[in-house]
Every structure is written in structure tokens, then in C-alpha cells.
């Protein structure tokens, strides 16, 4: 359905931009599963909140080894319902998000770009943030050179707008 929707939008002279929230997820996401939605659900791995052996364990930064039901993870601006994603320690998460960056701007979906939520707050350091967005842009532009990378940022965006990270 989505590919047909985008095609119809394009026929009408409009563009489709996806909202990418790559800084954090919800505490209900299967990766963390703080609400235990998937804990006993068939076909789902245990979330990182539930088990230290979760395949998603490295997707988050835990401050204490207190499983099961580990509340000691970093949240975006301290919000425990918005667990911050931990790209620096998780090549698996990084690769997964780069795959997503490419997938949606490629056929059959052909969306026209990404709007990036709280983009400058992504990693634990500005150096890593710049590295991540350079790789994100490279992946998007290799898949669709016409796709736009539009970021939400509060403050001076100059260092992000050098032609190798965000378009605007």
C-alpha cells in the first residue's frame, strides 16, 4: 500500500518525507520492552529491559547491571519513556538504521527524504553525531541522490550544514 501511496502523491506533484526518530525510541518498543508487552509473546526476543541476554542489549546504555527489569538506562533528557539509543556501543544498531535510511528512499517506496527528530542529540558526543549523520547522508544519497535530509536542530546549525550531513 505505501509504495502505491507514494506513487500517487508523486503523480499529483507532491513529495513524501518520513519523520525519522533515531535518537530514542519508546519504552514500549520491543527492543527495550519496559511495559513487558512482548515478554512472553511468541516469536519475540526478550527486550533489553527484561534480560541482559537480549539481542537488543547493546542498543541502550545501562548504568547498572540489575536484571531482570533494569530501570537503569539512559533516557533522552532523563525521560525514562524515551530510552536513548546507544549507537557508539552497537554496530548492529548502527547498521540496522543505515539499512532503514536507504530502504525507504529506494524502490519500491521512493520517498523523497527524511526529517530528523532532535538530530544533534543523537550520540554521546558531537564527534560521533557528525560521524553518524555523515554516514546516514551517504547512505541516503547513494540510494537516492535527490532525497533531502532535513534536520530539527536548536542552536547554530553551521557545522551540520557543510554539504556532508544535513541539507537543511
Feature-to-residue mapping (PLM):
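Proline-rich intrinsically disordered, low-complexity coils
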Residues: 55, 68, 83, 91, ...
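Active-site-proximal helices and loops of the catalytic beta/alpha 8
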Residues: 6, 10, 23-24, 29-59, ...
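Transmembrane beta-barrel strand/turn architecture of Gram-negative outer membrane proteins
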Residues: 17-18
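The substrate-binding groove and active-site-proximal loops of carbohydrate-active enzymes
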Residues: 1, 27, 78-94, 117-128
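Short, flexible, mixed-charge acidic loops at enzyme active sites
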Residues: 61-77
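Short, acidic/polar
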Residues: 90-107
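Short, solvent-exposed loop/turn segments at the edges of secondary structure
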Residues: 78-80, 109-111, 165
